[in-house]
C-alpha cells in the first residue's frame, strides 16, 4: 500500500489576544496551584460575554478530591481578586483533568502518544477543523495525529482544543 501521506498545517497566529490572556492567567495561577502541591495541568478561559468561564485543571499523584479543588479555588480566587486580570464577570471552575483530559502542552501530547484524541483547530485545514484519530506523538512544535491512513502535522499554536478519548477496553 505504500507510505501514508503526511499533511502539514502552517500555523497562522489567530487568537493572539486570547493566547496572551491565557499566558497571563497561566503565569499568575500556576505558581499558586504548584505552591499548594498540585500540578497545574492547564487553564482554559472561555469568554462568552456575561457567561465567561475560567477553568483550572489540577492533578497530583493519587488523583484529585473535592477538597483539593476547594483549596485551589480559595487561593486562586484570592489572587484573582487582588490582581484582577479579568475585567468582566466570570465563573471560576477548578477540577481534575478527568478521563477525557484536555491536552495543552507538547509534553502532554508526547506523554499520551498511542491514545485516541479529538482535536479542534482554530481555523480550517484541508477543509476541516476537527480531527479524531491516533495521537502519534510530537515533532518539534507539531502534534502528529493519524486519521484513517493519513498523518497530519498540526502546529500546537493552531490547536484550539484537544482531548483524550477514553478507552474502556
Swiss-Prot record:
One of its GO terms (cellular component) is cytosol. It is found in: Cytoplasm. InterPro entries: Ribosome_maturation_RimP, RimP_C, RimP_C_sf, RimP_N, RimP_N_sf. Its main location: cytoplasm. One of its GO terms (biological process) is ribosomal small subunit assembly. Signal peptide: none annotated. Keywords: Cytoplasm, Ribosome biogenesis. Gene3D superfamilies: Ribosome maturation factor RimP, C-terminal domain, RimP-like superfamily, N-terminal. SUPFAM superfamilies: YhbC-like, C-terminal domain, YhbC-like, N-terminal domain. Belongs to the RimP family. Required for maturation of 30S ribosomal subunits. This is Ribosome maturation factor RimP.
Amino acid at each position: 500500500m505504500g507510505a501514508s501521506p503526511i499533511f502539514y498545517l502552517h500555523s497562522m497566529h489567530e487568537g493572539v489576544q486570547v493566547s496572551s490572556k491565557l499566558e497571563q492567567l497561566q503565569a499568575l495561577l500556576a505558581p499558586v496551584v504548584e505552591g499548594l502541591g498540585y500540578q497545574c495541568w492547564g487553564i482554559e478561559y472561555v469568554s462568552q460575554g456575561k457567561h465567561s468561564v475560567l477553568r483550572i485543571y489540577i492533578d497530583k499523584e493519587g488523583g484529585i478530591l473535592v477538597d483539593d479543588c476547594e483549596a485551589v479555588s480559595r487561593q486562586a480566587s484570592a489572587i484573582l481578586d487582588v490582581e484582577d486580570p479579568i475585567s468582566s464577570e466570570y465563573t471560576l471552575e477548578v477540577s481534575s483533568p478527568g478521563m477525557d483530559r484536555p491536552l495543552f502542552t507538547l509534553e502532554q501530547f508526547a506523554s499520551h502518544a498511542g491514545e485516541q484524541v479529538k482535536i479542534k483547530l482554530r481555523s480550517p485545514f484541508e477543509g476541516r477543523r476537527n480531527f479524531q484519530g491516533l495521537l502519534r506523538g510530537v515533532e518539534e512544535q507539531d502534534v502528529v495525529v493519524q486519521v484513517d491512513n493519513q498523518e497530519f502535522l498540526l502546529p500546537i499554536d493552531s490547536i484550539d482544543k484537544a482531548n483524550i478519548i477514553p478507552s474502556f477496553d
